[in-house]
Curated annotation (Swiss-Prot):
Source superkingdom: Bacteria
Cited Gene3D superfamilies: Aldolase class I
Protein's organism: Crocosphaera subtropica (strain ATCC 51142 / BH68) (Cyanothece sp. (strain ATCC 51142))
Keyword Translocase: no
Protein name: Indole-3-glycerol phosphate synthase
Catalytic activity: 1-(2-carboxyphenylamino)-1-deoxy-D-ribulose 5-phosphate + H(+) = (1S,2R)-1-C-(indol-3-yl)glycerol 3-phosphate + CO2 + H2O
UniProt keyword list: Amino-acid biosynthesis, Aromatic amino acid biosynthesis, Decarboxylase, Lyase, Tryptophan biosynthesis
Pathway note: Amino-acid biosynthesis; L-tryptophan biosynthesis; L-tryptophan from chorismate: step 4/5
GO molecular function, one term: phosphoribosylanthranilate isomerase activity
Name of the gene this protein is made from: trpC
EC number from the UniProt entry: 4.1.1.48
Family: Belongs to the TrpC family.
């Protein structure tokens, strides 16, 4: 998958120079590219309201981050559960109309979740960094900021709002960007969860130092098709290196039944990230119990 960071104009050659500048009317090739383009503009607006310097000053007074990886390794369930606080998605639209992030988060904790994931994207998932802050005030377990991270600014903002871990999506980041952002995350005492969708992306991530937690997304972000075989195939293909490096694997997307959970567990997943199948239930606590009945 190729992600262009900004919609380009056709290249223009002037003498021996070749110019290519952003085209505000360019069309994205797929939803992930559209999201990344939107993030470019969104972060620019955020910086206008609050500078990175001022944001970093706020971060210095934030409480220490909680041990996200430790919570997974000592999971209350097997595999460990990262339960997602999620109102909507591009593929499903609004998942829960009566969306109360704090109540949902508390129900997840009661059900035995080891960690929570909170969507902060507003345009495509109807989340917010304010929701992250509200959940942080209400629960004590570690929190993952589920965002499309392309700039350090977003990482500092997530830390200020209470995140203990940050999602990094390999598909939208160059290797050099991944390395740089991972270094920043570690420097703030947080855990990077690096998400992959293919064997090529997994190989890229395994070549980077500082990676201890890898998420395998079973959803094809171009077609939205879901296959749990993605988790099985990727773990099988690189199981020796994963074991040797002591890397924890999180299976993400498409887990709706005890049979699904059993499949990814037997494949070798240490944890699962589940949102839709829990958040749409009237009683998320009971939904967790039902799901882990395999």
């Amino acid at each position: 998958m190729q992600i262009r960071r900004r919609p380009p104009n056709p290249a223009v050659e002037v003498d021996i120079l070749r110019y290519q500048v952003p085209d505000p009317n360019g069309k994205a090739n797929h939803i992930l590219e559209e999201i990344v383009w939107h993030k470019e503009k969104e972060v620019e607006r955020m910086r206008d309201r609050l500078s990175l310097l001022d944001l970093r000053k706020q971060e210095q007074s934030a409480p220490p981050a909680k041990d996200f990886l430790g919570a997974i390794s000592q999971g209350k369930t097997q595999p460990a559960l990262i339960a997602e606080v999620k109102k909507a998605s591009p593929s499903k639209g609004v998942i829960r109309e009566d969306f109360e992030p704090v109540a949902i988060a508390q129900a997840y904790v009661q059900g035995g979740a080891s960690c929570l994931s909170v969507l902060t994207d507003s345009k495509f998932f109807q989340g917010s960094f304010d929701n992250l802050a509200l959940v942080r005030q209400a629960v004590d377990i570690p929190l993952l900021c589920k965002e499309f991270i392309i700039y350090p600014y977003q990482i500092y903002l997530a830390r200020v709002k209470g995140a203990d871990a940050i999602l990094l999506i390999a598909a939208i980041l160059k290797d050099s960007d991944l390395q740089y952002l991972i270094k920043i995350i570690h420097g703030l005492g947080m855990t990077p969860l690096v998400e992959v969708h293919s064997l090529a992306e997994l190989d890229r991530v395994l070549a980077i130092e500082g990676v201890s937690l890898v998420g395998i997304n079973n959803r094809n972000l171009e077609t939205f098709e879901v296959s749990l075989e993605t988790t099985t195939n990727l773990i099988t293909a690189r199981q020796d290196e994963i074991k040797e490096r002591g890397i924890y694997i999180v299976s993400e997307s498409g887990i709706h039944t005890p049979q699904h959970l059993q499949q990814v567990t037997e494949a070798g997943a240490n944890a699962v990230l589940i949102g839709e199948s829990l958040v749409k239930q009237d009683d998320p606590t009971q939904a967790i119990a039902n799901l882990f009945s395999f």
